[in-house]
Amino acid sequence: MCDMGGLDNLIANTAYLQARKSSEGDAKELQKRRKSLSLPPPDVSRNEVKETITLDYQSICVEQPIGQRLFKDFLATVPEYKLAEDFLEEVKEWELEEGSAKEQLMEKLVSRRFKEPAEGSLNFLGKDLSSRIQQAQSKDMPELILLAKDSGNAFLMDAPFQDFQNSPFYDRFLQWKAFERQPINQKYFYEFRILGKGGFGEVCAIQVKNTGQMYACKKLDKKRLKKKNGEKMALLEKEILEKVHSPFIVSLAYAYETKTHLCLVMSLMNGGDLKFHIYNVGDKGVEIKRVIFYSAQICCGILHLHSLKIVYRDMKPENVLLDDHGNCRLSDLGLAVKVKEGKAITQRAGTNGYMAPEILTDEDYSYPVDWFAMGCSIFEMIAAYTPFRDPKEKTSKEELKRKTLEDEVVFPLPTFTEEAKDICRLFLAKKPQNRLGSRTNDDDPRKHAFFKSINFQRLEAGMVDPPFVPDPSVVYAKDISDIADFSEVKGIEFDDKDAKLFKRFSTGAVPISWQKEIIDTGLFDELNDPSREVTGGGNSGEKSGVCSIL
């Protein structure tokens, strides 16, 4: 007999893998669509968005990819400004280098920029700093280069930024901002196979029609949200995701609504979650060099959340996803919460086996709970079970709580290195004030010997090769037949209060993620080409003040 479930899964996987491949190059349909696109006229853009933009240098010229690109293009037109920008790029290259190569780069930088005859005058340094640099010994030079870097950045924030705002490059930035703000709905995407399900809906793979970019779409059922009082939680997750911009946390690209769902469009992580790799790929557990690499990236992600006054509350391998290259990101911020000044967190949240003692005893808690869960996750990556469960038989909820509160962690496997044992013990301290990451205000887990092989500056710059690269021909997700269907929710009606919340949720494209997509897929260069011709069609019937870009 024909296995229809297996056939459905094969068809879904084939379409999904084909879409992933096609996103790497322009198919005929994609080319046709892109030829119909054009930026709105400068006068329209200026009138629409100029008054709504905060003239903040960091936001426009550093954080927003299109703003950064256009600002660099502007700097290239003024020799003095270009000199400052080139110098800062050289300093950045020096900061990220290692060992003897770093020493050589410093010598080259000093010789080129500070010794007579220098290649252009760095006027922004000022007489005092210039004099100190000229008289400095080699051992003092790194500190002085960083001071020169600060002076260079301060210079670009002043006259160059003001001049940029009066240039055609800024007008072009406003055109892109107008494009960015057009309404988004489900017609802008192709939808592919379901990747998983959660408490309020499903996650499926989608593709932006006019760029080919692949994403994961978390579709939250409106009726199910209302029935379970989850509407505010969905809005909070969306608002937190908007604030987060880290290579170690999934990025939110779009937020929109359909008649039945609230949709969060986020980074598509094709490599599967760490739980899958621990239990389903090869021998159980993950080799130690991968554990160190993933743990380093996870630490960076958690520290980024904490810097924004956000407690994650659901750190576990299942919520850590791998991308095509083998880098990992934190996902599912549905339980994340913003810490309010002077207000304690008391609500119990998390997953059994990863919850800290202070959550289990219903005490006030804060950031240290994430570090406890981090310790559980490192242990699980190595041992293929969590530290307070019995690996050979099922542990009851009550026994798990007792062990978490009373038992010290033990390491029965030889795969635990001494550094791994130590970092687990420190993360799993019963009292939050004794826990690694929380002992003092500047207690940084990245300084632990467990991470001695990691250069975190290079890691954060994406310059460290992952120790494992997922197979691009494999779908790291359950068969669609294994993903249970939801039953229909009946008897739920929406009112004006619901409509207002849905509207707050549905804000369209998220600037940084959207701009990165436009640059990465080549659409930025294509639409900025002055010789480019625009043809009609390719808009799928959407009506907008400008041609649809998404």
UniProtKB/Swiss-Prot annotation:
Gene Ontology cellular component list: cytoplasm; membrane
Residues in AGC-kinase C-terminal domain copies: 452-517
BP GO terms, sorted: regulation of signal transduction; signal transduction; visual perception
Enzyme Commission number(s) from the entry: 2.7.11.14
Keyword Phosphoprotein: yes
Residues with lipidation of kind S-geranylgeranyl cysteine: C547
RGS domain mapped to chain residues: 57-174
An MF annotation (GO) of this entry: ATP binding
Membrane topology label: Lipid-anchor
Posttranslational mods: Autophosphorylated in vitro at Ser-487. Phosphorylation at Ser-36 is regulated by light and activated by cAMP.
Keyword Membrane on entry: yes
Tissues in which the protein is found: Retina, cones.
Broad EC category: transferase
UniProt keyword terms in alphabetical order: ATP-binding, Kinase, Lipoprotein, Membrane, Methylation, Nucleotide-binding, Phosphoprotein, Prenylation, Sensory transduction, Serine/threonine-protein kinase, Transferase, Vision
SUPFAM superfamilies per record: Protein kinase-like (PK-like) (SSF56112), Regulator of G-protein signaling, RGS (SSF48097)
Residues modified to Cysteine methyl ester: C547
Segments for region (Disordered): 22-45, 531-550
Gene3D superfamilies: Phosphorylase Kinase, domain 1 (3.30.200.20), Regulator of G-protein Signalling 4, domain 2 (1.10.167.10), Transferase(Phosphotransferase) domain 1 (1.10.510.10)
Modified residues annotated as Phosphoserine in this record: S36, S487
Localization: Membrane
Family: Belongs to the protein kinase superfamily. AGC Ser/Thr protein kinase family. GPRK subfamily.
Misc. comment: Although the protein is present in a diversity of vertebrates ranging from bony fish to mammals, the mouse and rat orthologous proteins do not exist.
Record protein name field: Rhodopsin kinase grk7-b
Organism: Xenopus laevis
Lineage: Eukaryota, Metazoa, Chordata, Craniata, Vertebrata
